[in-house]
């Protein structure tokens, strides 16, 4: 009994150690390689100006953003799977990411003029624009999937359709951009945190931290929802009210991550599933473990994306998709 109680803590401790290892590897690797000893010297204020620039202005913001986005997307996926009672639910598959991406591209196209020169104000407005698009996508999916209730398979099929529609609109507005912005938007939509900076971190940090804490606070309702709507209602839970609140939290988390990293598919599917297998379905432990696993997977994928074809770079979203697509197919076959 004691081992079962301690298992989530053990999983989080091991995952944290893995994050620390990849953190330092990611700091050292890149087009400009910095030896571990020199990295420590920089942190103690004894490094060269070049090493300080590379670490503090390029690599460290990117690593921190990877950890935040990985945690946010993974917890959003865990919420969606529980709220919809559908183990295949995930922000990318359901079209929520595509809605947020479309809103961000529209914001840049109409108000900022260039994807490469966002103002300080524009950077902080990105999560709000992504949230508007993600909420619109979620609303459309919920309305179109409703037919005397929402079945899991209908939710997935409608989500795929909405996803395709938003992606078509994305392409239309991309084609109206100049060639440089078109390429940047295409890479970003594929999932990329190239060009991560401290402004972007400060823009999404409050959203992700507050919503993670809020989700932990609401974990007991996610546990009850797993029992089914009738039993949950019998236990005195306002099921529809709590479902809408938690759905909004998941959409907002996903939108914040879209604003920072574009469309990241499958991470919100993989991390909660791995966490559930390791620690069980209790959301008081499932949520933090999902966040840890998601952060680790995203940071690992981004480190690979930066270095496998260096000096060229692969969008991190493509790396995650290569890993996640087979797992999604496996779950589909398992669910029959």
Curated annotation (Swiss-Prot):
Cellular component GO terms, alphabetical: plasma membrane
Localization in the cell: Cell membrane
Broad class of the protein's primary localization: membrane
Protein topology in the membrane: Multi-pass membrane protein
UniProt superkingdom: Bacteria
Keywords: Cell membrane, Ion transport, Iron, Iron transport, Membrane, Transmembrane, Transmembrane helix, Transport
GO BP term (any one): siderophore-dependent iron import into cell
Transmembrane domains' residue ranges: 9-29, 63-83, 91-111, 124-144, 155-175, 193-213, 245-265, 285-305, 313-333
Keyword Plastid: no
Xref: PANTHER family: FERRIC ENTEROBACTIN TRANSPORT SYSTEM PERMEASE PROTEIN (PTHR30472), IRON(3+)-HYDROXAMATE IMPORT SYSTEM PERMEASE PROTEIN FHUG (PTHR30472:SF64)
Subunit structure: The complex is composed of an ATP-binding protein (FhuC), two transmembrane proteins (FhuB and FhuG) and a solute-binding protein (FhuD or YxeB).
Free-text function comment from the UniProt entry: Part of the ABC transporter complex FhuBGCD involved in iron(3+)-hydroxamate import. Responsible for the translocation of the substrate across the membrane.
Family according to the record: Belongs to the binding-protein-dependent transport system permease family. FecCD subfamily.
Name of the featured protein: Iron(3+)-hydroxamate import system permease protein FhuG
The species this protein was found in: Bacillus subtilis (strain 168)
């Amino acid at each position: 009994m004691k081992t079962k109680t301690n298992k989530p803590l053990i999983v989080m401790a091991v995952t944290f150690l893995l994050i620390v290892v990849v953190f330092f590897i990611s700091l050292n690797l890149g087009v400009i390689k910095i030896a571990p000893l020199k990295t420590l010297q920089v942190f103690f204020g004894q490094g060269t100006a070049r090493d300080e620039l590379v670490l503090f202005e390029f690599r460290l913001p990117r690593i921190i953003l990877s950890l935040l986005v990985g945690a946010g997307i993974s917890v959003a996926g865990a919420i969606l799977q529980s709220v919809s009672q559908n183990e295949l639910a995930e922000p990318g598959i359901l079209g929520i990411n595509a809605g947020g991406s479309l809103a961000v591209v529209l914001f840049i196209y109409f108000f900022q003029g260039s994807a490469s020169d966002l103002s300080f104000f524009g950077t902080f407005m990105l999560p709000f624009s992504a949230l508007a698009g993600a909420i619109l996508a979620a609303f459309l999916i919920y309305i179109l999937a409703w037919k005397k209730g929402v079945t899991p398979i209908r939710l997935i099929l409608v989500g795929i359709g909405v996803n395709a529609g938003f992606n078509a609109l994305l392409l239309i507005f991309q084609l109206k951009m100049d060639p440089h912005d078109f390429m940047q938007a295409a890479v970003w939509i594929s999932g990329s945190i190239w060009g991560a900076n401290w402004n972007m971190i400060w823009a999404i940090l409050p959203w992700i931290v507050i919503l993670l804490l809020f989700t932990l606070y609401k974990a007991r309702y996610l546990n009850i929802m797993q029992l089914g709507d009738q039993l949950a209602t019998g236990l005195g839970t306002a099921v529809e009210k709590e479902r809408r609140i938690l759905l909004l939290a998941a959409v907002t988390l996903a939108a914040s991550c879209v604003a920072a990293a574009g469309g990241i598919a499958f991470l919100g599917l993989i991390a909660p599933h791995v966490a559930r297998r390791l620690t069980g379905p209790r959301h008081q432990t499932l949520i933090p473990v999902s966040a840890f696993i998601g952060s680790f997977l995203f940071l690992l994928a981004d480190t690979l994306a930066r270095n496998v074809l260096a000096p060229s770079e692969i969008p991190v979203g493509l790396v995650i998709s290569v890993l996640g697509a087979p797992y999604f197919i496996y779950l589909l076959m398992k669910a029959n």
